[in-house]
Amino acid sequence: MAKNNLCNLINEFIDTILHMTNKFRVGDIVYVSRSRARLDINAPSALYRSEIVEIRNRSAKIKLLEDVSSFIPTSALVKRLGILVLKIGDFESEDSLLNPLRESLRHYFSLLLSEGEVLYWDVRSLDELSRFWKTQNNHNAITHVILVGHGKSNSIKFGDTWKLSKEINDILNLDGVFPKQFISLCCETGIANFGKMFSQLPVCESLIAPFQSIHGSIASQFCQTYFNYLLLQGKTSGVSFKKARDATPNATSFRRWKNGKLIS
C-alpha cells in the first residue's frame, strides 16, 4: 500500500511539472476554473476566459471584470479547451447503451460548459471517422476526445466489424494536429495492446481507458467525476484521474497512458 501511495505521489508530481512546461506569458488568454478565480459559479460555464496580467514564479493573476484575481497556480490554467464526444456505433446496442451513455455526458456537459465548448459526433465506420477527422477545420480547438463505443484489448467495434488499433491510429494521426487527451469509455482499451501504441501517437497527449470490461453507468460516472475535478475544481489531469478513480465505485480498472508508458 505504501509503495502504491509513493508511486501515485511521484506520478502527480511529474504530471504537475509536465503541465507547467506549457509556459504562460503576460497577455496570454487562458481558461481557469471559476472557483479557482473565486468567481460566482452560477454561470453557463464552469470556466472563466481571461487575460494574464501578472506572473510570479508558478502563479499568475488574471483580469476580472472590474479587478484582478489573486495569484492562481499556473497548473490550473489552460490555453485551449474543447471537448469532442465521439460515439462509435455498433447497431446492436446503440439504443440500450451507447446512446444513453452519450446523452448522460451531454446532460452533464450542458451543466458544466457553454454549448460551443463541446462537440458531439457519431460514426459507424472508419470511412466516416476519416471524413470527419480530415474535414475538421478547427482541430486545434479540440483538447479532449471522449470515445463512446465497444472495445477489446486490441480493437474498437465500428458498426458490425472490429477494427484494430493500428487502423484507427492511421486515421487519427494527421500532420499538424494539436495533441489531445483521449478518454476511452470502450472496454479493455486500457490494455497495453491498444493503449501503449495509441498513446504514442503524436495526436495523443495521453490516454485514459479501462483495462477490463466496464459497465456503462460506471463509465459515465467516472468520466463526469474526472471532468468535475479537472474543470470545475481546476486540478491537474493526474490529480483529477486519481480522485475520479478513487471516488467512483468499481472504476479501479481505468489506467492512464502517456508516450507508450503506463503512468497511473
What are these regions (language model features)?
Residues 58-61:
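Short aromatic-glycine-enriched beta-strand elements
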Residues 65-82:
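Intrinsically disordered, low-complexity, charged/polar segments
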Residues 6-26:
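Mixed-charge, Lys/Arg-rich low-complexity intrinsically disordered regions
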Residues 79-147, 151, 161-165, 179, ...:
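A domain-level signal for caspase-like cysteine endopeptidase catalytic cores
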Residues 42-55:
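Short beta-strand-centered aromatic/proline hotspots
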Residues 181-264:
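Active-site-proximal C-terminal subdomain of hydrolase catalytic domains
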Residues 143-156, 201-207:
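Active-site microenvironments of hydrolase-like enzyme catalytic domains
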